[in-house]
Every structure is written in C-alpha cells, then in structure tokens.
Amino acid sequence: MKATSKIMYSMATFLAIMAIIYLFATMHVEDSGYMVGYEWAGGVCMILGTLLTVMLGGYLHFTENRIDVLPEDWEEAEVADAAGTLGFFSPSSIWPLAMSGAIAVLGFGIVYMHYWLIAIGAVLLIYTTTMLNLQYGIPKEKH
C-alpha cells in the first residue's frame, strides 16, 4: 500500500503540473473561430483528475497506516506470501467462448443501432453467464 499511495501522489503531482500548463496554454491561444480565454471543459477535467488521484492516494495512505505490513511492502517476502487461493479452474468449459460471442452480438447491435440485435445479444449474454455460473451445479444428465 505504501508504494501504491506514492504512485497516486506522483500521478496527482503530474496531473497538477499538466493542469497548470493547460491553463496557461489555453489562455494564450487565440483562434478567430473560437472564444478567447481559458478552455473550461479540459481544464475542469484536469483539475478533477488531480483531485481524484489525491483522494485515492490519501485513502491508500490512511489505510496503510491502520493495517499490518503487506507482503509487497516487506523486503524479505516471497511470491508465495502474497499468493492466495486460486480456486477451481475449468479447462474444458465452452461458456467463456459462448459469452464472447454473445458480447460480440451485443456490441454489433450497439454499433449499428439494431435494437433487435441488442435484444438478442442481451438475452444470449444473460443465458451464457447463467450457464457459466451453473455449469457444475446442474446434474451431468442435464448438460
């Protein structure tokens, strides 16, 4: 967590510097087809991005002070110290491929604004997600 909060603080510093540069750059650019002065949309986004990274860095910093030393902060830690339980892996499941196809159908429906294709893709995605979650909860004769 200590390294993560330092990364967030350094990102916030970078974004603050870029926001200041953006402020001065947009104030001195004059375009006859556009209004002269500070460009608000980009400037507000830069400032809000800075504030959000400061907020996240502060949260990580305060959380790090209240917990024990994590394996990534301990210099003598092994890789196995941070490794958790991976759980069960199904190497022969067809449902991730089917979900990819359903997402592709849904994506094509959204791209081309075909509502019938969006509906079919959504139904397929719900069905394939359900089957992925229930593939070992259904008896073998129902597969």
Swiss-Prot record:
Family: Belongs to the cytochrome c oxidase bacterial subunit CtaF family.
GO molecular function, one term: cytochrome-c oxidase activity
Assigned EC number: 7.1.1.9
Keyword hit for Transmembrane helix: yes
Record key words, sorted: Cell membrane, Membrane, Translocase, Transmembrane, Transmembrane helix
Claim: Transmembrane helix is one of the keywords in the record: yes
Biological process according to GO: electron transport chain
Reaction(s) catalysed by this chain's protein: 4 Fe(II)-[cytochrome c] + O2 + 8 H(+)(in) = 4 Fe(III)-[cytochrome c] + 2 H2O + 4 H(+)(out)
Species of the source: Corynebacterium diphtheriae (strain ATCC 700971 / NCTC 13129 / Biotype gravis)
Membrane topology qualifier: Multi-pass membrane protein
Any single GO CC term annotated in Swiss-Prot or TrEMBL for this entry: plasma membrane
Domain of life: Bacteria
Main subcellular location: membrane
Subunit structure: Associates with subunits I, II and III to form cytochrome c oxidase.
Main function: Part of cytochrome c oxidase, its function is unknown.
Subcellular location: Cell membrane
Lineage: Bacteria, Bacillati, Actinomycetota, Actinomycetes, Mycobacteriales
This protein's name: Cytochrome c oxidase polypeptide 4
TM spans (from-to): 7-27, 40-60, 85-105, 106-126
